[in-house]
């Protein structure tokens, strides 16, 4: 890239402008990276909490596992698992759209209270909690994934600015400055030499 840049005053000016823009934008990128690091940590905690709630609900259901061999109870549980609607929205976090669960609507249980034991209500409650937490954990993991991906992308850009773009532009500015300085010295020398020759010719002409 640098070999294609002409060593001129205009190129020097453009490189200085480029460096100023890079150095102005870098702090914004670093701030975004810092904010994303905080948000990723929050998302990890949120995801872990939702997964834990999901697993606890699952363990509560497993405590009744031997009862699932009874068809009547299986039907009662199956009727309580239906998800009618999951309302999802999106929120903007440091310029990134991430999913959030607004509401989860489950169908009303339709099993017969008279034909099932009283503890079936507890099992159905655990089952509904299991379904809700499963959905929330999936959305929380998706939110975490999106934020982690954005953090990786921003980190790459910060590294690109710090390790490549800014150093390369700085070196190019110095290279052009040295070239222009050397050329200026050469030009001054040539002018002096030309004046000296003119003066010599003038003196020789006067002597003749």
UniProtKB/Swiss-Prot annotation:
InterPro entries for this protein: V_ATPase_D
Pfam families per UniProt: ATP-synt_D
Keyword field contains Protein transport: no
Keywords, in A-Z order: ATP synthesis, Hydrogen ion transport, Ion transport, Transport
The family this protein is said to belong to: Belongs to the V-ATPase D subunit family.
Job description of the protein: Produces ATP from ADP in the presence of a proton gradient across the membrane.
Protein name as catalogued: V-type ATP synthase subunit D
């Amino acid at each position: 890239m640098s070999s294609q840049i002409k060593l001129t005053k205009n190129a020097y000016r453009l490189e200085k402008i480029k460096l100023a823009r890079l150095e102005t934008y870098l702090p914004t990128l670093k701030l975004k990276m810092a904010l994303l690091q905080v948000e990723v940590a929050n998302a990890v905690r949120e995801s872990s909490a939702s997964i834990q709630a999901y697993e606890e609900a699952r363990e509560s259901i497993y405590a009744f596992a031997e009862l699932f061999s009874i068809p009547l109870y299986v039907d009662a549980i199956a009727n309580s698992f239906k998800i009618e609607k999951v309302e999802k929205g999106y929120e903007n976090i440091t310029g990134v759209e991430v999913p959030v669960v607004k509401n989860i609507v489950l169908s009303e249980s339709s099993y017969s209270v008279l034909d099932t034991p009283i503890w079936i209500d507890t099992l159905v409650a655990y089952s509904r909690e299991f379904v809700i937490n499963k959905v929330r954990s999936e959305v929380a993991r998706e939110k975490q994934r999106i934020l982690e991906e954005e953090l990786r992308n921003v980190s790459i850009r910060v590294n690109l600015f710090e390790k490549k773009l800014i150093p390369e532009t700085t070196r190019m500015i110095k290279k052009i400055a040295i070239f222009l300085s050397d050329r200026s010295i050469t030009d001054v020398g040539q002018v002096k030499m030309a004046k000296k020759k003119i003066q010599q010719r003038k003196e020789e002409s006067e002597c003749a």
